[in-house]
Amino acid sequence: MNSNKHVGVLVGGGPAPGINGVISALTLEARSRAHKVLGIYNGFEWLMKGEARQIRELDHNDISRSHFQGGSILNTSRANPTKKPEDLQRVLETLNKLGIGYLATIGGDDTMFAASQLAKLAAGQVRVCHVPKTIDNDLPLPGDIPTFGFETARQLGFELVHNLMEDSRTTGRWYFVVVMGRTAGHLALGIGKAAGATLTIIPEEFTGPVHLDAVCDILEGAILKRKALWNRADGVAIIAEGLLERVPAEELSRIEGVRIEHDSYGHLRLAELDLAYLLKTLVEHRFASRGSPVAVVHKNIGYEVRSAAPIAFDCEYVRSLGYGAVDFFLSANPELAKLNGALVCLIDGKLQYLDFADLLDSKTGKSRVRLVDVQKPAYKVAREYMIRLEKEDLEDAEKLGLLAEAASSQNQRCTPEDFRARFLHLVKG
């Protein structure tokens, strides 16, 4: 441990509630141990250009009460220093030039991967501690430990959906609500289950590629079942944004007006594709074509929860993580000193440090992603309370008759046999 080395901190990826609490706790603890803290603006963006001016020393005045605020006082960026070896080398050289011997990175899976590669390249010149942040909750933390920001995003999403459910009931129409989450359905399921939404669709329930027709079948079946068995024309369907990651590119490219773009880490820019509007259009067309129109309103939840003020859970949580990052850097523990880089987390209330090597996928070399386990009770309980077509609906003659009647109109009659043949694929397996 060298007391002359400074502690640097940067934020990568999308915003999440609690970022400023990490920066605040880290700054207070590092300064109490006689280390300067240098805040680095816009993630890796300037470091990988060799630019050392977008830095400021942080003191008490910079971070006072900032833990209550959403957003990031250091901004954030998706700049990827791992695309080119020379960019990563430039990051290391710039950190050395600034006298930064300890770097805390706050971010999700992409920032964690960049942090792991920097730690590997630095080989001890700069020790790196990653603080896991994402409202997607998809970093591979042990057990069911959430990433910070998730609980705040879930709470705000829950409140929005609660209001939409009341509007849906009052006006007699459906809402299709797409919830942010690039790969995993944690946030969508967390919101839908807590709010008691009519149904929630997540990518993990599909065993292969996701086809938009199959998603529309699920939605259409739910609308018909609610009408047939409860005489209700309203409902709220929560749909995970990450479904789009599983839709074949050629299928997306055939959709008029869709432009496929990727970010600096190679991910599909999901927010540029309005899945909620697309599904609304497709499902409304199905009902209109048989002469029984249905009213659907599309809504997206994501950006409005990312920079919200953190709830108490996240305020408390990130204070421990910010402290933990400094403790990783400056602890006298010889076992920690052996690690050039690690991810800090809380396990059973204790600070733990996970080696980056254990968090990378052995096949891809990239960060592993934590998906929703659809075999666990948490998902099965959520599914139990959804309104979706089930196997018994197609086997019960009375229910099947009511469903077929709901699917009929003056223009087009649907027999029980027709209905069963049409939707049987949803309940197989």
Report the location of each language-model feature.
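C-terminal non-catalytic interaction/assembly regions of soluble proteins
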Residues: L252-I255, R259-G429
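Short, ordered loop/turn segments at secondary-structure junctions
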Residues: G12-G14, I40-W46, R78-A79, G108-D109, ...
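A short, small-residue-rich loop immediately preceding and capping a beta-strand
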Residues: H6-G14, I19, G101-D110, F176-V177
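Accessory alpha-helical/coil subdomains and C-terminal extensions
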Residues: V37, T94, Y102-G107, F113-Q117, ...
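Short glycine/serine/threonine-rich phosphate/pyrophosphate-binding segments
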Residues: A16-L26, L47-M48, P85-D87, I106-S116, ...
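N-terminal phosphate-binding or glycine-rich loops at protein starts, especially the Walker A/P-loop
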Residues: N2-E51
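Glycine-rich oxoanion-binding loops at beta->alpha junctions
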Residues: M1, M48-G101, T111, I135, ...
